[in-house]
Regions:
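Flavin-dependent oxidoreductase catalytic cores
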Residues: 1-173, 177-193, 198-201, 206
Length: 208
């Protein structure tokens, strides 16, 4: 025996598609035949940005779909959609909006996110920017890349930073996320790093 999970959109979120009311009926029809409802949103043809919320949408913008469907069924309900804040995920479950919170892009950004939460190291989490670099790279090359995790797609090469054979003085121009990570990596390899930033604070666009 194994659990059966069904992923569907609580609403297709466009005129002519089915709405949340019909999403509830779909869930009720499936309820006796499956073990868990995985509630997403939108469609790939129309509403890709609803299925995969970008940085321009509120965190948890699709949770209401799972929350409403959960009121009408007796089996566990999962939610998904650009969630990357452990405190928000905990609130979703604790408040009964969903029984399970799924992550995808958040684990590309930081594969160790669940472990860090379990070890009370939330401040060490590298958060997904919801910038779609991973989606664009897959379309272009068939693999993945991530703005905040340069090791994604290079797992077979190993993720250990090796000491440089020749130590150099390295100049990094720009103290945004990429520059900071480059400086950190170069320093780990043993180089002498100088980081230059024209603004008064590090972080690039993130500091805003």
């Amino acid at each position: 025996m194994f659990p059966i999970e069904f992923r569907f959109s609580g609403s297709e979120l466009f005129e002519g598609g089915y709405d949340l009311e019909e999403g509830v009926r779909i869930a009720q029809t499936l309820e006796s035949r499956i073990d868990l409802l995985h509630v997403s949103a939108g469609t790939y043809q129309r509403g890709f940005g609803d299925t995969h919320p970008s940085m321009f949408k509120d965190h948890g913008c699709n949770v209401y779909l799972a929350a409403e469907i959960k009121k009408h069924v007796s089996i566990p309900v999962a939610t998904i959609g650009g969630l990357n804040d452990p405190a928000q995920m905990e609130e979703i479950i604790a408040s009964g909006k969903a029984d399970v919170v799924y992550m995808a892009r958040a684990l590309l950004a930081d594969p160790f996110l669940p472990r860090k939460v379990m070890e009370n190291r939330s401040e060490d989490i590298v958060h997904c920017l919801r910038c779609f670099t991973c989606m664009a790279e897959r379309a272009a090359t068939g693999t993945r890349r991530c703005t905040v995790n340069p090791l994604i797609g290079r797992e077979m090469e190993g993720d250990e930073v090796q000491p440089a054979l020749v130590k150099k003085k390295v100049l990094i121009a720009g103290g945004g996320p990429g520059g900071l990570y480059a400086a950190w990596t170069a320093a780990r390899r043993g180089h002498s790093v100088v980081l230059c930033e024209k603004e008064v604070a590090l972080g690039g666009i993130l500091k805003s």
